[in-house]
């Protein structure tokens, strides 16, 4: 039986920290005694969040404004860590977004950015920070994937592929490090109470009843305490994820296409959905 992960005195880097699941992670880790480095694009939101955490939890909270789709994003973070003498013990790769629409209608630049933010940033940050965790014989990485990782996702084709990457990547890195004191979890939430589906509408996209972000984060930390390699959030979502194993890939894709298809003409304009 694994011991609960102790965040006291540890430094956690949280990407996409300005809102939604990332913000909820920041509060949860502050409550558990972690120091925080908050990363996102919105300086004002990060500044306000850091101030709230210091006020409410007497937390050591720093922030760094970075666009993770930029070529030098991880270099910028690395430089900040070296300049401040910061050693990261916990990495929360939460930043991400989805471009919603028929694949060919979505600008290629947006889909490339989707891969950069959802996949490449997580890969590069893990590659940057994992050796330090190994040297200190302890640490944790939580990669925020999605239930979209378990099947093809028409109208969010690239998004689903990026989340499948995160799931497979996380499980592999977990296996490589399971005896080295490092825990790696792929967190797979379904619909969540964030702005993610505001444009589409939960009813239109048939994504189910959104779950509070606090519940998602609580499930993530529960999985981390048990050294699980992945965690699907919610009993209904776990059932649906397992049902995919009983269907052919073609059948799964056809069913999800019907669920995610918009009511209007299928040649609808593409829309970005922020995580």
Listing of model-derived features with the role each one plays in the protein:
Residues 94-99:
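Conserved NAD(P)H cofactor-binding loop of Rossmann-fold oxidoreductase domains
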Residues 34-49:
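Conserved glycine-rich Rossmann-like NAD(P)H-binding loop of the short-chain dehydrogenase/reductase
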Residues 146:
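Residue(s) in the substrate-gating loop at a strand-loop-helix junction
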Residues 11, 18-19:
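Conserved glycine-rich cofactor-binding loop
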Residues 126, 162:
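Active-site helix of classical SDR
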Residues 186, 204-241:
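C-terminal helical subdomain
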Residues 102-115:
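Substrate-binding pocket helix/loop in short-chain dehydrogenase/reductase
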